[in-house]
């Protein structure tokens, strides 16, 4: 009987130690917020410098995509700007299959911004039967995220 009472207390103590360690790690990360922000800003600045010096449409597209990723959970309106730039340069690439990826990324940015209905409208433009395996996965993940955000919001 004594063991039945002590054993759960022992497990609780171990979990408490683990929780303290996790909280300490989180506190350490939060205390370095400014450092992480400076790193992110440097990465974004470096990408913009490369973009300013690039004349190749393929390279510009890649840089727009990188800027989208760098901005998505940082400044989603800027992420949306670079997605729109990708769409503008798309005709020069002669790769129409990228249009669906751009639409999915636009929907993702809109969802992050709280524009859930607009995000769903973007996704509705896509015929999933036309997507390759990777893009189809991204399509459904974005739909799932939008429905999750809508559920959280309502």
Regions found by a protein language model. Give the residues of each.
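A "functional boundary" signal
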Residues: 2-4, 10-154
